[in-house]
Structures are given as structure tokens and as C-alpha cells.
């Protein structure tokens, strides 16, 4: 025990903590007896352990799960609500006194010893445990005693929650956005007239009337370059475009962000999605969008101290990353899994159509590797040569079969740059296939079967999805299909049904028509985690031809405190809301073929929903992207800090392949940046009834959902070698 911890143990608990403690003991006489009879913390631990073991041993399935003799979805689904609590209590005892590096506190030590904290509070009135801690423990023992039950909401209730959230296709919302567009354009016209803005492409002819200027500006609205040129880069301009609707506290935070050097980049189209005149039928409906634009105090405080969440993103050329992969350089290729690697081009693709407040690459903005200096991001003359060398990595690798081109944002590259990148991918894939003809059976490499483009522009800037871009994508799809590439995927990030606008719908239709399947990766932020919000998004996306792929917990540390929704909420959403969209296995063969006929996605999804009587296709998996080991929601809650923040121990997703190096890695510890109490208080602050979320306390165990066949790689007609290329021992 460190001196600092010893000092914390002597801190008196607050009046609120005393009140919660008294309630805890009053409801649990057996616990009170253990605590009052224990002479020290060890006796308290032994007493609790023996008590709980006596209960759990009566359920062999739960006991085997606790002992880790069984695992997986089937074993998880056999657990009762009380089993969740018993396993957590035993894990608390087994991990008592463990120290963890807490990056939420910039690497300070966090210690979990909840039974000791209760004993100190009972015996001495000390331990320094906060009310958030005691509230969590109160709910835990209620769950263990059977006083706190879980009532699954009906489908009707989930659909009632969904109906609270309008989409951007609602005629009333469309009308509001038209008003916003008019206000924004009139401000831009005024600034051009005053000479505050001068541009060689966007200007007015002498003698034009105000009506003529407005009609010309309306034409500009359909031009992606207009939105990039007139993107807001300062708090004052943002407030002006939003009709001076931002309150003084928000402006103070934004001024701090500007002073700290955090980039601002909000284009006029995306700004028009924010409410200025809040309609009675959509109060709070734009919060998931607003929280992507407006920075939090925690982000500002941590900017400059943000550490890379992704251990495998820390790369030294020639040395293995955390997952064991050797990469050619530090910036352009990222890799975690055997089958897929990320390519980040040295083009405009290093920029985005806007900066998301909870961006996973905020670390790269902090160190200047990503930015919005668009002119400086144009490709240099040496890029074509470098691209060929980078694609050589994919060509020579024995297991890579999937290339994800992202950034930044893949579609921020110009049509010409993107066409050259895709031509390079085509040549690489062709060379890889040709080289296989010379290899013996059992020695053949994986060939490229999937190409993905990572982009948020269908959301941020749907004007980018032009007929010319669709032509580039369609041409590549046609010729690449002839050499064995079978899956062409646009991987995007819709965060709210309010982002699904007529412009976004038309952009997706154009992408589908080019033969590309559009999938969505939803970030489960605080506003997006409200009851029914994620399910409504799934439904609306299905209606415009998008398949749901992942629902990601917000990753990062204290910089993303504000937007973080706890992993317990992610499990709750999976078990209680998304479940009404569960796809029966009888439709698996049908849905597996959806990407082969992307042009008919809307019709095929609609037909399947009608026949299966589902409100949406729950084809996504709720996961957290873990440092080093990838996506998983397989965890157990093994600890809790005196501030009530839970400590989760994650395992690999055993349903997919991993680097052999990861088999030797320890489990991954995640200390959540906020307690359940703090999360619920945030929800209450944005108008939610916390009683709707009552079961969240009990979801202390998670299990990754199986991947549906829709997202599996096509099978080869030959056996791929077992050998791994570019694999080494990871850097410590």
C-alpha cells in the first residue's frame, strides 16, 4: 500500500456516504455482522467471500463461469441476475488491493479494495469513499439479495422510446434546416459584401441584387468546396452562424479551447443541423450532433496531455507494435488483426469534414499529424512512389485480405487522388493474385477480397458524394470484381437519426448505385446512449440502405469524460433494446449476399424486415475498441475505485482471428472515467428519467456478440498458408 493510499484511508467519509452506508447495512444484516465482527480488513474479505461462495455454489453454471471454466455467449446467457452480483463480489475479493495505472488521472495509481472501504467506514468512519461508491455497493448487494430485479422492456416500450427521436427526414425538421440554411447564407452574403470574405471561386458579380446573390449562394450550397471554404474556425463565428444562441458558459469553454490550440472546423451544412429555434416535438433531439461540435471542459483541460489509446498505433519503423506487427513507417499503416490493415494516405485524406469532439485520433491532432490546413495536405510529387511502397506491404503479406483506406477521411481526397489510390490497390491485388499462381498448395497467400473506405462525409458533407465520385468508385468496383475482389464497403459514422437528411439519403443512394455497400459504425456517446436513440438510428439507416456494423463505446480517457457512456450501458442497450432487431439464423444466407447486390440494398432490407417482422436489422455488435487487442465487449467488473468508477477486465473477442502474439498478452484493464451515478446524473441533466435505466447497475459482465455472416470474409477456393508475415515480438 502506498503512502498516498494510506492517507486516503484515513479520510473521513461524508454525511451522504454515512447515510448510504447505514442504508446498506440496514438492508443487509449478514453484511453488517461480518463487518462488525471483523478485526481487520482480511477477516472482512474472508467473511464476504465465504458468504457469497455459499450462495453461488448452489448454481453450478454460475460457479463454473466465476472460475473461468466456461466462457462464451452460451455460458453468459445462463447466468441469472443474482449470479452477476455474486461473481462481481467474488471478483472484488479476489482482486482486493490491486493497483492499476489510471490514465484518467494521468497515470496515477488507482487501487481497488471495496470490502476494505466498507470495513473502514463501518469501523472508523474513514476510507474516503464517496457517495458514488456507496450507491454502487448498495445496488450491488440489492442485486445479490434479490431485492433489485431486472425487468426487460417490451418491444412496445422500446419502440415508444424510439419514437421520441425524429429523423432528419421528418418534414418539420427539413423546414427548420431550411430556415437555418437561409440564416447562414445571409450571414455569408453580408460578409462578402463587406469585404470580410474574399474568394476567387465564390463571389458576386457587380450590380447583383440581394435576391440574385441569395440564389447564387443557394447554388454554392450544393458544392462541397463551398462548405470547406466557409467552414467555421473560431468560437465567435460559430456563435454568429448559430444566431448567437450559445450561452456564456459554452462560449467561455470554446474560448479556452481556442486558446489551447484545439482546432475548430464546422462546415455550414453540418451547422445547419443544429437547432437554434428548438421545436416542441424535438427538444434535445440534436444533442448527439451538438456534443460533436461543442467541446467539453475535460477535453480542454486534458489537451496537451492526451496519450494514445491505441497501443498498436505507437509505431517505430522496423519494430513490432503492441499487437506484434512490423510496419513500414509510423504514420501510414496501422494494423491490429492478421486479415486487415489500415492505410492512411499522404493526401487531403488526412483531414476531415469536421472535428468530432470525441475523435479517437485527437492524440494525432494534438501532435500535429492531423490538421485542417487543407492546402498543406495536398499530395507531394513523391506520394505516388511512396504509395506503391506502402501497397507493397499488403502485396507481400501472407494474411492480409482486406484494406481499409481512411485518415482523417478517405473521401477528403480529391477524385483524382482517390482514383490513383484505388488504381494502386487494383495493381497490388492483381500482383498478389498472380504471385499465388507460382506458390504450392498450402503455401498460397490470402488475396485481397475486401476494399473499404472510411469516411464521415456522407454525414458531415454529403455534397462530396458527386456523380463524378460515384463514377470513380463504380469503375474501380467493375474492374476489381474481375480479379477476385468481392466486397466494396463504405464505412461511415452516423451518430444520430437527425443526421439522416435528404442530402445524406441521396448520397447513400449514389454510393449504393455505384455498387458499394454502406455500413455504419455508431459511437455510443452520452447523448446517443439515451433510451431508444441507437435503435431509432438503426431503423432510419436501414430505410436509406445502410447496414449497421458496430456500436462503439467512446474510448479514450478523461478527455472524453463528458461524452463517455459507460460500458454497462452498452451491455444494457444490447440486451434490452437492440434485441428487438435480432436476426433469425434462417435469414443468414440471404443477408450474406446483400453486399453482392448493393444496388438493391434498400429493397432487400425492406423485404427482409417485412418478412421477419423486425423494426430494424440488429446487425451491429456493441463493443469497445481496446488498446492493443481490438474490439470486444467481453469483460468482468473486477474492481471499483473509492470514487465509484468501475474497473473492468477485458478479454479478446474469441469469435475472430488475432495476432499470435496476443495469445501471450495479459487481459486488458479499463478504468472507466465516470461512475454509474455520474452517468445517470448526466442523463438527468439532459431530460432523461433515470428510472428508465435502473437495470444498468447490474450489468457487471459483458460478452461479445457473435459476428453475423454478413460481415465474414468470402471463402477461398484454396487453403491459405498458416505462416505469418511481418510478425515479431511487440515492443514493451
Predicted feature locations:
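Flexible, acidic/Gly-rich N-terminal and inter-domain linker regions that tether
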Residues: 1-337
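Radical SAM enzyme [4Fe-4S]-AdoMet core and its adjacent flexible, acidic
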Residues: 13, 25, 29-51, 56, ...
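N-terminal pre-triad scaffold of radical SAM enzymes
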Residues: 266, 322-364
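C-terminal accessory regions of radical SAM enzymes
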Residues: 266, 575-732
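Catalytic or ion-translocation cores adjacent to nucleophile or general acid/base/metal-coordination motifs
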Residues: 335, 346-350, 364-375, 454-455, ...
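Glycine-rich, often proline-containing surface loops adjacent to acidic residues and nearby aromatics
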Residues: 337-341, 355, 397-406, 451-454
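Conserved alpha-helical substructure of the radical SAM core
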Residues: 351, 362-403, 420-424, 428-432
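Conserved AdoMet/S-adenosylmethionine-binding subsite of the radical SAM
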Residues: 387-395, 411-583
